């Protein structure tokens, strides 16, 4: 099967040339005279004399932290999203397991090291690399949540004296609740940017948003059951993160199980 799209080459008139004839624009880019598709289900795209698979074009995909259709970046580097997503997911999982008191461990101190170096430094570095990849959404998300985990670790560490600066434990919990509510607002903003993406991508940010909201409520109300609920939401969030990270790592060349992106139900297909 072969379909063609009419000539896309455009010319502009140089009004200063004194000629009524259109003058072509000359630059370093080769003109694209024709785009066509071929193969079963139009899986190949032909641009001039070059052939690409449709999968070579970026689309909404959790494995790249790309919330919508986007052109390929001009620089060729490895995909930093799986590193950032894995760092986020593992740190979130350990923290959330402590929150639900798995195996009788309510103290989240074991997650401080992860929050500093993996969920913090590694995730932040992955976010910086997303800027190089020209992915603004991925950069904003990974650097911000890397900063979140480092700031949470600072709150938990006695060396910073943050908790000791408050007069009583109730005041500490209220302050942490305000802190988490701020992160709920930020995550709500990101979630709204994933409505045209995939189910797994949207699910990650929606569940994270709900986790922040429930944990914020648990802190300001000092309600133990609400905190447990927030912990379970965090566990679900972590597995969404692991799934999106795996989606960015797996391909037909290294795995027999390659996730297929499932678009949100109301997203229009091109």
Curated annotation (Swiss-Prot):
The modification Phosphoserine is found at residue 74. Residues 1-33 are annotated as: Disordered. It comes from the Eukaryota. Induction: By acetic acid and ethanol. It is found in: Membrane. Keywords: Membrane, Phosphoprotein, Transmembrane, Transmembrane helix. The modification Phosphotyrosine is found at residue 58. One of its GO terms (molecular function) is acetate transmembrane transporter activity. Pfam families: Gpr1_Fun34_YaaH. It is a multi-pass membrane protein. Belongs to the acetate uptake transporter (AceTr) (TC 2.A.96) family. Plays a role in the adaptation of cell metabolism to the utilization of acetic acid, possibly by inhibiting an anion-transporting ATPase and affecting the plasma membrane H(+)-ATPase. May be indirectly involved in the repression of genes encoding glyoxylate cycle enzymes. This is Glyoxylate pathway regulator.
């Amino acid at each position: 099967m072969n379909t063609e799209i009419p000539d896309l080459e455009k010319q502009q008139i140089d009004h200063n040339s004194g000629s009524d004839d259109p003058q072509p624009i000359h630059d370093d880019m080769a003109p694209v005279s024709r785009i066509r598709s071929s193969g079963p289900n139009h899986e190949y795209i032909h641009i001039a004399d070059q052939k690409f698979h449709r999968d070579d074009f970026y689309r909404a995909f959790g494995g790249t932290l790309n919330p919508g259709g986007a052109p390929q970046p001009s620089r060729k580097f490895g995909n930093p999203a799986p590193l950032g997503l894995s760092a986020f997911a593992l740190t979130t999982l350990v923290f959330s397991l402590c929150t639900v008191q798995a195996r009788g461990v309510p103290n989240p101190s074991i997650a401080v090291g992860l929050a500093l170096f993996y969920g913090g430094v590694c995730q932040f570095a992955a976010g910086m690399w997303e800027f190089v990849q020209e992915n603004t959404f991925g950069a904003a998300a990974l650097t911000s949540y890397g900063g979140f985990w480092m700031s949470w670790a600072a709150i938990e560490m006695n060396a910073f004296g943050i908790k000791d600066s408050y007069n009583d434990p109730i005041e500490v919990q209220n302050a942490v609740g305000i802190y988490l509510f701020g992160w709920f607002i930020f995550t709500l903003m990101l979630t709204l940017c994933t409505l045209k993406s995939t189910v797994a991508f949207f699910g990650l940010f929606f569940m994270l948003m709900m986790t922040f909201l429930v944990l914020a409520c648990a802190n300001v109300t000092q309600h133990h059951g609400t905190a447990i609920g927030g912990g379970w939401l965090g566990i679900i969030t972590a597995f969404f993160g692991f799934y999106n990270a795996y989606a960015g790592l797996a391909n037909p060349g290294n795995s027999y199980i390659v996730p297929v992106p499932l678009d949100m139900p109301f997203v229009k297909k091109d």
